[in-house]
Every structure is written in C-alpha cells, then in structure tokens.
Amino acid sequence: MRKNNTAIIFGSLFFSCSVMAANGTLAPTVVPMVNGGQASIAISNTSPNLFTVPGDRIIAVNSLDGALTNNEQTASGGVVVATVNKKPFTFILETERGLNLSIQAVPREGAGRTIQLVSDLRGTGEEAGAWETSTPYESLLVTISQAVRGGKLPAGWYQVPVTKETLQAPAGLSSVADAVWTGNHLKMVRFAVENKTLSALNIRESDFWQPGTRAVMFSQPASQLLAGARMDVYVIRDGEGN
C-alpha cells in the first residue's frame, strides 16, 4: 500500500448497527486483549461457555492440566468450553490470524457465558493485507468507505466490537465510538458526535484529525452542527491510531 498525503473523503454514508441479547440470556462480555496477553475471566462450571474472537476464528484450544471437560468449535469460528473445576486454571486459544490468547479461567456456578475476545487485528490477515497493499492509497480509502456503506466489507475485513476507540472532538462537541471495522493495516471507526452547546458550531473534517488518521467523513455534507444536534463521523486510521 503506497502512502501519499492523508486525504479527506466527502460522501453521504448511512450505516446502522445493532446488538441485541435474547430474553433470558446474558449479553456477551467484551474483553480487550493483545496478542500473547492474558486475561482473567469468570466462566461457568455448571454450563457451557462460548468464546469468540470477532474478525477471526479460533482453531485450537490448549489446556495442559486437562481442566476442560469439553471444547467444541462452532461453525462461526468460536469455541464452546466446559469445566467442572472449582479452582482457577489456564488455557490457550490459537486463532487463524496467528493470535495466541491466554485465558485464566475463574470457575463459578451459574449460567454459561459468552465472551468476545477483542484484539487489534491490524497487521494480521493475509487476504486483507494483499488487497490493501496492491490498491492505490486514495482509491483504497474510497473503496473502504463505499464497501462499508454498502454493507459488503472488503475481503479480509470484519466488524469488531468497540473497545478503546476515542476521537478528539472540538470544544463543545462530544464523541462516542459505536462501530468498528478492521482490516490488515487500516481500520474504520464510526463516532456519534453531538453538539452540547446552545448555539450552532462550525465543523470541518479536519477538526477531527489526530495521529494515525488517514480519512475523515461526515455522514452527510455539513459545515455546521446545530445546538443539540447529532451526526455520525467516520474515521479511517492506520496502525498508529486507536
């Protein structure tokens, strides 16, 4: 992928994203992790537990002490694990993209849990990497925005849960990340931006620039945000930005 000058892309982008838990079930627990890192996670020792790595597939489960009574891979790339242990133990998850995630399981009675292990996938995934490096830089940014808008992500790109993504908004504006899409070297984040003041504020895409930013897009053409109004701001970042 050839890096030219950073670019601001204009366009009307309309996206929607929703997450819903079925009645009577626990909502998924999102656990941020880094490759090679470890997390202490409470799991059920009376019901099965589901582990997933959004944007990746778990291909192996390793438990040296045999504490897992069962582990079964799902068609979607997750793994269902079960234990009757009462004491903490450790197991390792290996993924298709080359991640190794260490889980310090803390067993307890209760409903089975759904755990989403969210790791920064940038720098992994051969399919996304090949496409990103072979596409001219400006065309790459435009194609990513159009693909997400159309609901069909580029090859090797995935939507992942929000973790620590932030946006440095100008004075008077608040911002909250509500959706993330990631590839190999780049990721795209959607922020809900709101005018908290009692008057209209002038806004430009460049107002939302920060280290690692490669493109900023408004959900609709705008030069002002009215008092109390909200709009979506889409930011494409490289490996330097969160």
From Swiss-Prot:
Membrane topology, record value: Lipid-anchor
Keyword Nucleotide-binding: no
Gene Ontology annotations for the cellular component aspect, listed alphabetically: cell outer membrane
Signal peptide: 1-16
Annotated Pfam families: TraK_C, TraK_N
Main location: membrane
Subcellular location, record wording: Cell outer membrane
Keyword set, alphabetical order: Cell outer membrane, Conjugation, Lipoprotein, Membrane, Palmitate, Plasmid, Signal
Role according to the record: Involved in pilus assembly.
Descriptive protein name: TraK lipoprotein
